[in-house]
């Protein structure tokens, strides 16, 4: 099963050149991310990988990285191709955690989307792909406010068969 998990602003923005605008400001979202992905397999792009000093605990950490990317930090495993990786792990629970290019590359195969909707436009330069035609909203939690930022959690389930 392939799940994509992301926090997005009202324009589906996920990051800008300085990183994730709400990073560290909404700890409930960070806890939600940990709770959902714990004990699972996570797949991230190289840019997302560079944001981590160490692998995420209680998870298998895979990075889509080109051979010329150099040696990865201990605890991370490089994979050359997301599609091939997903073919090999098709029966496992895999979480794609970013970045924007990897979300776009894997959306057609995703079974579920777990989104944190952050209220406002944070002038992001990197975006989550449009998805509403292939997915149906399954649940939407009540809003939270932390550090002056309003957000809520959504779960979307695929309604149109995934493509490989």
Task: Kindly label every feature range from the protein language model.
Residues 1-164:
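Enzymes that bind and transform nitrogen-containing heteroaromatic metabolites
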């Amino acid at each position: 099963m392939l799940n994509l998990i992301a926090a997005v602003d009202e324009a589906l923005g996920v990051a800008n050149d300085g990183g994730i605008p709400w990073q560290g400001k909404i700890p409930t979202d960070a806890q939600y991310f940990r709770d959902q992905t714990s004990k699972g397999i996570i797949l991230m792009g190289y840019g997302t990988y560079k944001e981590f000093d160490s692998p995420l605990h209680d998870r298998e950490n895979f990075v889509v990285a080109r051979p010329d990317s150099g040696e990865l930090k201990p605890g991370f495993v490089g994979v050359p191709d997301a599609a091939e990786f997903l073919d090999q792990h098709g029966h496992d629970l895999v979480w794609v955690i970013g970045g924007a290019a990897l979300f776009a590359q894997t959306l057609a195969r995703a079974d579920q989307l777990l989104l944190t909707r952050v209220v406002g436009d944070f002038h992001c330069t990197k975006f989550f792909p449009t998805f509403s035609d292939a997915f149906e909203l399954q649940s939407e939690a009540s809003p939270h406010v932390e550090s002056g930022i309003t957000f809520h959690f959504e779960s979307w389930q695929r309604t149109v068969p995934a493509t490989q």
